[in-house]
UniProtKB/Swiss-Prot annotation:
Belongs to the universal ribosomal protein uL14 family. This is Large ribosomal subunit protein uL14. It comes from Rhodopirellula baltica (strain DSM 10527 / NCIMB 13988 / SH1). Coiled coil: none annotated. The keyword Cytoplasm does not apply. It holds the Pfam family Ribosomal_L14. The lineage of its organism: Bacteria, Pseudomonadati, Planctomycetota, Planctomycetia, Pirellulales.
């Protein structure tokens, strides 16, 4: 579960390394976000020469969470890190590559471009 002030790794090649959640989108009193949710983030650290600059406010979709997520078949999925992929206002990824595995729940939330770029869907 991700909430305000949570720090997350960036799993794409936009140049951002780490972001901090500043808002969970989808309701005025919504506090937590999980895999497949869109959040608003502030970029905290970047790779030199990247297209995304430090302190930029960006949108991102959550692709991995440490908190175990229950699936309809009764199984649970858990990752080693909290990670996001930066997206634009139309929910298309800003980068051209995605590193690491992504959760299958992204397919249900119509993030097909992210699912197709990922090398592993768990």
């Amino acid at each position: 579960m991700i909430q305000q002030e949570s720090r997350l790794d960036v799993a794409d090649n936009t140049g951002a390394r780490e972001v901090m959640c500043i808002k969970v989108l989808g309701g005025s009193r919504r506090r937590f976000a999980t895999v497949g949710d869109v959040i608003v983030c502030s970029v905290k650290s970047v790779i030199p020469g990247s297209e995304v600059k430090k302190k930029a406010v960006v949108r991102a979709v959550i692709v991995r969470v440490k908190q175990p997520t229950r699936r309809p078949d009764g199984s649970y999925i858990r990752f080693d890190s909290n990670a996001v992929v930066l997206v634009d206002k139309d929910r298309n990824p800003r980068g051209t590559r995605i590193f690491g595995a992504v959760a299958r729940e992204l397919r249900e939330n119509n993030f097909m471009k992210i699912v197709s770029l990922a090398n592993e869907v768990v």
